[in-house]
Amino acid sequence: MKILKIKNLNLRIHEKEILKNISFEIEEGEIIGLIGESGSGKTIFTKYILGILPIAAHFTQESFEVVPKIGAIFQNAFTSLNPTVKIRKQLQHLYISHYGNKKNWKEKIESLLEDVGLDKKKNFLDKYPHELSGGEQQRILIIGALIGEPNFLIADEVTTALDVETKIEIINFFKKLQKKFKISILFITHDLSTLKDFADKIYVMYHGEIIDENHPYRKQLFQLSQNIWRRKQ
């Protein structure tokens, strides 16, 4: 079963071509990596999938299919969370937006806290975002994305600005969550090393295009990453 299928997408903003002839597929249960440098078109591609394009955007496509239940986590956890509202209230609001009431919300949130490795005894729910570490903030965002029980999760640059140890922890959480919930994941990053031993398939976006394995930029990118991995070993 296909979770996402896009064929021949072209998108421009104010006459500037942003995405060109994009064809892209994700199967049920797959973890797909999308890598590209800043400005390559990754973020606008994410917004296209989620249906939150700017008014100035115009696009054409041959076909577009996506499952109805999508969760999304974005790059900056601190700006994604309301700094003036405690975590409990923010997650409760998300729960109500999905289910229309607060019935069983506490059991749901406590279960998700355990899933992402946050000890409920430490009272994370009664803290403000600034009282949490970067890794803890990202895990709260993961909980928010999972509340609605999506079968497709988009993670957009979620390991940016995190230290190496925290990056590894977050990646391991995504692996565990994928196995437990059987969801498909689109993991978007500019850091290829993040996707090592994680993604089932890796797409490379370059100047708004998905490039193939023979493209010079892709070859150079993968060769550089292999050299870095060797030096780390």
Task: State what each model feature region is.
Residues 147-151:
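A short, proline-enriched helix->beta-strand linker immediately N-terminal to the Walker B motif
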Residues 153-156:
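Catalytic Walker B motif of ABC-type/P-loop ATPase nucleotide-binding domains
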Residues 35-37:
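The feature captures the beta-strand-to-loop junction immediately N-terminal to the Walker
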Residues 195-197:
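A short, surface-exposed alpha-helical micro-motif characterized by mixed small hydrophobic
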Residues 128-132, 136:
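Conserved ABC ATPase signature
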Residues 205-206, 213-233:
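C-terminal boundary and immediately downstream tail of ABC-type ATPase nucleotide-binding domains
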Residues 104-123:
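Conserved ABC ATPase "signature" region
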